[in-house]
Amino acid sequence: MEKLTYQFLKDTGAKVPIVGGPMYPGSNPELVAAVSNSGGFGVVQPLALTALYGHDFREGLQLIKKLTKNPFGVNFTIFGGANKKYHKQMERWMKISIEEGVKFFLTSLGKPNEIVKVAKQHQIKVYHDVPNKKVALAMKDCGVDGLNCINWRGGGQTGIQSAEKFIEELHDIGIPLICAGGISNKEDYKKALEMGYAGVQMGTRFLATHECKVTQSYKQAIIESSEEDIVWTNKIAGNNSSVIKTKDVMQGGLRTGPVINFMLRQSKLKRYARMYLMSQGLKNYNKTAFDDSVQFWQAGKGVGNIKSCLLYTSPSPRD
Protein backbone atom coordinates (compact mmCIF):
# COMPACT_ATOMS: atom_id res chain seq x y z
CA MET A 1 0.00 0.00 0.00
CA GLU A 2 1.31 3.45 -0.94
CA LYS A 3 2.26 5.76 1.93
CA LEU A 4 -0.36 8.42 1.13
CA THR A 5 -3.12 5.83 0.71
CA TYR A 6 -2.26 4.61 4.18
CA GLN A 7 -2.38 8.21 5.40
CA PHE A 8 -5.82 8.71 3.83
CA LEU A 9 -7.15 5.55 5.48
CA LYS A 10 -5.71 6.74 8.79
CA ASP A 11 -7.29 10.18 8.32
CA THR A 12 -10.74 8.71 7.64
CA GLY A 13 -10.82 5.39 9.45
CA ALA A 14 -11.96 3.68 6.24
CA LYS A 15 -10.86 0.18 5.27
CA VAL A 16 -10.71 0.87 1.53
CA PRO A 17 -9.83 4.23 -0.09
CA ILE A 18 -13.28 5.07 -1.47
CA VAL A 19 -15.22 8.20 -0.52
CA GLY A 20 -18.97 8.34 -1.04
CA GLY A 21 -19.20 11.90 -2.34
CA PRO A 22 -21.62 14.33 -0.67
CA MET A 23 -24.49 14.97 -3.07
CA TYR A 24 -27.61 17.08 -3.31
CA PRO A 25 -29.75 15.10 -3.89
CA GLY A 26 -28.38 11.75 -2.75
CA SER A 27 -26.88 12.42 0.68
CA ASN A 28 -29.52 10.54 2.66
CA PRO A 29 -28.48 8.80 5.91
CA GLU A 30 -29.09 5.29 4.56
CA LEU A 31 -26.66 5.80 1.68
CA VAL A 32 -23.98 7.54 3.76
CA ALA A 33 -24.12 4.72 6.31
CA ALA A 34 -24.08 2.01 3.63
CA VAL A 35 -20.85 3.36 2.16
CA SER A 36 -19.17 3.37 5.57
CA ASN A 37 -20.58 -0.03 6.48
CA SER A 38 -19.03 -1.41 3.30
CA GLY A 39 -15.56 -0.28 4.30
CA GLY A 40 -15.55 2.99 2.38
CA PHE A 41 -16.10 6.46 3.79
CA GLY A 42 -19.50 8.13 3.55
CA VAL A 43 -19.72 11.94 3.59
CA VAL A 44 -23.00 13.70 4.33
CA GLN A 45 -24.09 17.02 2.81
CA PRO A 46 -25.88 19.11 5.51
CA LEU A 47 -28.26 20.95 3.17
CA ALA A 48 -29.37 17.66 1.63
CA LEU A 49 -29.77 16.09 5.06
CA THR A 50 -31.92 18.94 6.38
CA ALA A 51 -33.62 20.83 3.54
CA LEU A 52 -34.17 17.84 1.24
CA TYR A 53 -34.59 14.83 3.50
CA GLY A 54 -36.14 16.75 6.38
CA HIS A 55 -33.89 15.75 9.26
CA ASP A 56 -32.85 17.98 12.10
CA PHE A 57 -29.08 18.10 11.56
CA ARG A 58 -28.10 16.62 14.92
CA GLU A 59 -30.78 13.94 14.70
CA GLY A 60 -29.65 13.15 11.15
CA LEU A 61 -26.07 12.60 12.32
CA GLN A 62 -27.34 10.45 15.17
CA LEU A 63 -29.37 8.38 12.70
CA ILE A 64 -26.28 7.75 10.58
CA LYS A 65 -24.43 6.71 13.74
CA LYS A 66 -27.22 4.22 14.49
CA LEU A 67 -26.98 2.80 10.97
CA THR A 68 -23.19 2.40 11.02
CA LYS A 69 -20.56 1.99 13.69
CA ASN A 70 -17.90 3.11 11.21
CA PRO A 71 -16.67 6.69 10.74
CA PHE A 72 -18.21 9.14 8.27
CA GLY A 73 -17.57 12.78 7.37
CA VAL A 74 -19.44 16.04 6.86
CA ASN A 75 -19.19 18.37 3.86
CA PHE A 76 -19.18 22.15 4.28
CA THR A 77 -19.75 24.39 1.26
CA ILE A 78 -18.30 27.74 2.27
CA PHE A 79 -19.38 30.32 -0.36
CA GLY A 80 -16.89 32.82 1.06
CA GLY A 81 -19.36 34.18 3.61
CA ALA A 82 -21.61 35.58 0.86
CA ASN A 83 -24.72 34.82 2.88
CA LYS A 84 -24.34 35.68 6.57
CA LYS A 85 -27.38 33.62 7.56
CA TYR A 86 -25.99 30.55 5.81
CA HIS A 87 -22.52 31.17 7.28
CA LYS A 88 -23.99 31.20 10.80
CA GLN A 89 -25.88 28.01 10.01
CA MET A 90 -22.68 26.39 8.78
CA GLU A 91 -20.97 27.34 12.04
CA ARG A 92 -23.82 25.70 13.99
CA TRP A 93 -23.55 22.57 11.87
CA MET A 94 -19.82 22.45 12.49
CA LYS A 95 -20.32 22.80 16.24
CA ILE A 96 -22.90 20.00 16.23
CA SER A 97 -20.62 17.80 14.11
CA ILE A 98 -17.85 18.23 16.66
CA GLU A 99 -20.22 17.43 19.54
CA GLU A 100 -21.38 14.29 17.72
CA GLY A 101 -17.82 13.05 17.29
CA VAL A 102 -17.30 13.62 13.56
CA LYS A 103 -13.57 13.54 12.79
CA PHE A 104 -13.46 14.47 9.10
CA PHE A 105 -14.61 17.57 7.20
CA LEU A 106 -14.66 17.91 3.41
CA THR A 107 -14.80 21.59 2.42
CA SER A 108 -15.55 23.27 -0.90
CA LEU A 109 -16.19 26.59 -2.71
CA GLY A 110 -14.26 29.00 -0.53
CA LYS A 111 -11.29 29.42 1.78
CA PRO A 112 -11.42 26.90 4.67
CA ASN A 113 -9.10 28.85 7.01
CA GLU A 114 -11.62 29.19 9.84
CA ILE A 115 -12.77 25.59 9.54
CA VAL A 116 -9.18 24.30 9.54
CA LYS A 117 -8.40 26.36 12.66
CA VAL A 118 -11.36 24.93 14.57
CA ALA A 119 -10.80 21.41 13.24
CA LYS A 120 -7.21 21.28 14.44
CA GLN A 121 -8.37 22.17 17.95
CA HIS A 122 -10.48 19.00 17.91
CA GLN A 123 -8.14 16.64 16.01
CA ILE A 124 -10.42 16.70 12.97
CA LYS A 125 -8.99 16.14 9.48
CA VAL A 126 -9.93 18.55 6.68
CA TYR A 127 -9.77 17.79 2.95
CA HIS A 128 -10.73 20.43 0.37
CA ASP A 129 -12.17 20.28 -3.17
CA VAL A 130 -9.72 21.77 -5.68
CA PRO A 131 -10.03 22.41 -9.46
CA ASN A 132 -6.36 23.05 -10.31
CA LYS A 133 -2.77 23.36 -9.06
CA LYS A 134 -3.05 27.02 -8.05
CA VAL A 135 -5.95 26.37 -5.69
CA ALA A 136 -4.37 23.13 -4.46
CA LEU A 137 -1.18 24.90 -3.38
CA ALA A 138 -3.17 27.66 -1.68
CA MET A 139 -5.25 25.09 0.21
CA LYS A 140 -2.14 23.27 1.38
CA ASP A 141 -0.88 26.60 2.72
CA CYS A 142 -4.21 26.90 4.58
CA GLY A 143 -3.30 23.72 6.43
CA VAL A 144 -5.69 21.18 4.93
CA ASP A 145 -4.74 17.52 5.36
CA GLY A 146 -5.64 16.35 1.85
CA LEU A 147 -7.03 17.44 -1.49
CA ASN A 148 -10.11 16.22 -3.36
CA CYS A 149 -9.07 16.72 -6.99
CA ILE A 150 -12.24 17.48 -8.99
CA ASN A 151 -11.57 16.50 -12.61
CA TRP A 152 -13.62 17.22 -15.73
CA ARG A 153 -15.36 13.82 -15.70
CA GLY A 154 -17.16 14.45 -12.42
CA GLY A 155 -20.88 14.86 -11.86
CA GLY A 156 -22.48 17.90 -10.26
CA GLN A 157 -19.92 20.70 -9.88
CA THR A 158 -17.20 19.45 -12.15
CA GLY A 159 -13.59 20.34 -12.79
CA ILE A 160 -11.70 21.79 -15.74
CA GLN A 161 -8.78 19.40 -16.13
CA SER A 162 -8.05 15.69 -16.34
CA ALA A 163 -7.17 13.29 -13.55
CA GLU A 164 -3.83 12.75 -15.28
CA LYS A 165 -3.07 16.50 -15.25
CA PHE A 166 -3.65 16.68 -11.49
CA ILE A 167 -1.13 13.91 -10.84
CA GLU A 168 1.39 15.44 -13.24
CA GLU A 169 1.24 18.77 -11.41
CA LEU A 170 0.74 17.65 -7.80
CA HIS A 171 2.49 14.28 -7.46
CA ASP A 172 5.07 15.73 -5.07
CA ILE A 173 2.75 17.88 -2.93
CA GLY A 174 3.16 15.54 0.04
CA ILE A 175 -0.47 15.15 1.16
CA PRO A 176 -3.13 12.66 -0.01
CA LEU A 177 -4.80 13.35 -3.36
CA ILE A 178 -8.27 11.93 -4.00
CA CYS A 179 -9.42 11.34 -7.58
CA ALA A 180 -12.95 12.76 -7.90
CA GLY A 181 -14.71 12.33 -11.22
CA GLY A 182 -15.58 9.48 -13.57
CA ILE A 183 -14.96 6.62 -11.13
CA SER A 184 -17.71 4.05 -11.56
CA ASN A 185 -16.17 0.56 -11.64
CA LYS A 186 -13.20 -1.41 -10.38
CA GLU A 187 -11.13 -0.65 -13.50
CA ASP A 188 -11.52 3.12 -12.92
CA TYR A 189 -10.65 2.61 -9.25
CA LYS A 190 -7.50 0.61 -9.97
CA LYS A 191 -6.37 3.05 -12.66
CA ALA A 192 -6.65 6.00 -10.26
CA LEU A 193 -4.56 4.27 -7.60
CA GLU A 194 -1.99 3.20 -10.20
CA MET A 195 -1.69 6.84 -11.34
CA GLY A 196 -0.70 7.79 -7.81
CA TYR A 197 -3.91 8.88 -6.14
CA ALA A 198 -4.34 7.96 -2.47
CA GLY A 199 -8.02 7.17 -3.03
CA VAL A 200 -11.11 7.92 -5.09
CA GLN A 201 -14.41 9.70 -4.64
CA MET A 202 -17.52 8.19 -6.22
CA GLY A 203 -20.85 9.97 -6.60
CA THR A 204 -22.87 8.98 -9.66
CA ARG A 205 -22.27 5.28 -9.02
CA PHE A 206 -23.88 5.60 -5.59
CA LEU A 207 -26.96 7.39 -6.96
CA ALA A 208 -27.86 4.19 -8.80
CA THR A 209 -28.14 2.09 -5.64
CA HIS A 210 -31.11 0.85 -3.66
CA GLU A 211 -29.96 2.79 -0.60
CA CYS A 212 -30.08 6.14 -2.39
CA LYS A 213 -33.40 7.96 -1.92
CA VAL A 214 -33.85 9.55 -5.35
CA THR A 215 -36.51 8.68 -7.91
CA GLN A 216 -36.39 5.46 -9.88
CA SER A 217 -36.45 7.56 -13.06
CA TYR A 218 -33.22 9.28 -11.96
CA LYS A 219 -31.55 5.93 -11.32
CA GLN A 220 -32.81 4.53 -14.63
CA ALA A 221 -31.51 7.58 -16.50
CA ILE A 222 -28.03 6.93 -15.09
CA ILE A 223 -28.18 3.28 -16.12
CA GLU A 224 -29.37 4.10 -19.65
CA SER A 225 -27.08 7.08 -20.33
CA SER A 226 -23.71 7.15 -22.04
CA GLU A 227 -20.78 9.52 -21.63
CA GLU A 228 -22.01 11.47 -24.67
CA ASP A 229 -25.29 12.24 -22.85
CA ILE A 230 -23.50 14.39 -20.24
CA VAL A 231 -23.53 18.17 -20.81
CA TRP A 232 -22.22 21.12 -18.81
CA THR A 233 -24.31 23.93 -17.37
CA ASN A 234 -23.30 26.89 -15.20
CA LYS A 235 -26.86 27.50 -14.01
CA ILE A 236 -26.50 25.42 -10.83
CA ALA A 237 -23.60 27.11 -9.05
CA GLY A 238 -21.94 29.52 -11.47
CA ASN A 239 -19.23 27.09 -12.49
CA ASN A 240 -19.65 24.08 -14.75
CA SER A 241 -21.88 21.29 -13.48
CA SER A 242 -22.46 18.01 -15.29
CA VAL A 243 -26.03 16.93 -15.99
CA ILE A 244 -27.74 14.36 -18.19
CA LYS A 245 -28.99 15.90 -21.42
CA THR A 246 -32.80 15.83 -21.30
CA LYS A 247 -35.67 17.80 -22.81
CA ASP A 248 -36.11 19.72 -19.53
CA VAL A 249 -32.43 20.66 -19.40
CA MET A 250 -32.24 21.85 -22.99
CA GLN A 251 -35.49 23.83 -22.79
CA GLY A 252 -34.16 25.71 -19.76
CA GLY A 253 -30.85 26.44 -21.47
CA LEU A 254 -27.36 25.55 -20.34
CA ARG A 255 -25.93 29.01 -19.62
CA THR A 256 -26.87 31.87 -17.30
CA GLY A 257 -28.17 35.21 -18.59
CA PRO A 258 -26.19 38.46 -19.06
CA VAL A 259 -26.68 39.86 -15.53
CA ILE A 260 -25.49 36.72 -13.75
CA ASN A 261 -22.69 36.33 -16.32
CA PHE A 262 -21.48 39.83 -15.46
CA MET A 263 -21.59 39.11 -11.73
CA LEU A 264 -19.67 35.86 -12.19
CA ARG A 265 -16.85 37.78 -13.88
CA GLN A 266 -16.51 40.24 -10.99
CA SER A 267 -14.41 39.06 -8.04
CA LYS A 268 -16.52 41.01 -5.51
CA LEU A 269 -19.85 39.83 -6.95
CA LYS A 270 -19.04 36.25 -7.92
CA ARG A 271 -19.87 34.69 -4.56
CA TYR A 272 -23.27 36.43 -4.46
CA ALA A 273 -24.12 35.16 -7.92
CA ARG A 274 -23.15 31.64 -6.89
CA MET A 275 -25.23 31.85 -3.74
CA TYR A 276 -28.25 33.02 -5.74
CA LEU A 277 -27.88 30.22 -8.28
CA MET A 278 -27.51 27.63 -5.53
CA SER A 279 -30.64 28.89 -3.74
CA GLN A 280 -32.61 28.57 -6.97
CA GLY A 281 -31.08 25.18 -7.61
CA LEU A 282 -32.20 23.86 -4.24
CA LYS A 283 -35.82 24.33 -5.29
CA ASN A 284 -35.22 22.28 -8.43
CA TYR A 285 -33.33 19.58 -6.53
CA ASN A 286 -36.32 18.96 -4.28
CA LYS A 287 -38.38 18.16 -7.37
CA THR A 288 -35.56 16.15 -8.93
CA ALA A 289 -35.25 13.87 -5.90
CA PHE A 290 -38.93 13.04 -5.47
CA ASP A 291 -40.84 13.83 -8.69
CA ASP A 292 -40.46 11.30 -11.51
CA SER A 293 -41.78 13.81 -14.04
CA VAL A 294 -38.88 16.25 -13.51
CA GLN A 295 -35.93 15.33 -15.71
CA PHE A 296 -33.07 17.41 -14.31
CA TRP A 297 -30.43 14.93 -13.25
CA GLN A 298 -26.82 15.56 -12.25
CA ALA A 299 -24.36 12.83 -13.23
CA GLY A 300 -20.75 12.39 -14.30
CA LYS A 301 -19.15 10.89 -17.38
CA GLY A 302 -18.76 7.55 -15.64
CA VAL A 303 -22.41 6.78 -16.42
CA GLY A 304 -21.37 4.68 -19.40
CA ASN A 305 -19.98 2.01 -17.07
CA ILE A 306 -23.04 1.88 -14.80
CA LYS A 307 -25.37 -0.86 -15.98
CA SER A 308 -27.49 -1.74 -12.95
CA CYS A 309 -28.92 -0.47 -9.69
CA LEU A 310 -26.97 -2.11 -6.86
CA LEU A 311 -27.54 -2.97 -3.25
CA TYR A 312 -24.26 -1.51 -1.99
CA THR A 313 -22.78 -4.16 0.27
CA SER A 314 -19.32 -4.55 -1.30
CA PRO A 315 -16.28 -2.56 -0.10
CA SER A 316 -15.02 -1.99 -3.68
CA PRO A 317 -16.54 -0.85 -7.00
CA ARG A 318 -18.41 -3.49 -8.96
CA ASP A 319 -19.87 -3.75 -12.48
Language-model features, listed with the residues they occupy:
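Active-site entrance/lid segments in N-terminal catalytic domains of soluble metabolic enzymes
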Residues: 1-176
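Hydrophobic alpha-helical packing residues
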Residues: 147, 200-203
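Glycine-rich beta-strand-to-loop/alpha-helix junction loops that act as flexible
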Residues: 178-183, 202, 311
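Amphipathic alpha-helical blocks and their helix-capping loop/short-beta junctions
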Residues: 213-278
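Short glycine/proline-rich, acidic loop/turn segments that cap or connect secondary-structure elements
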Residues: 276-300
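Conserved small/polar residues in nucleotide/adenosyl-binding loops
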Residues: 312-319
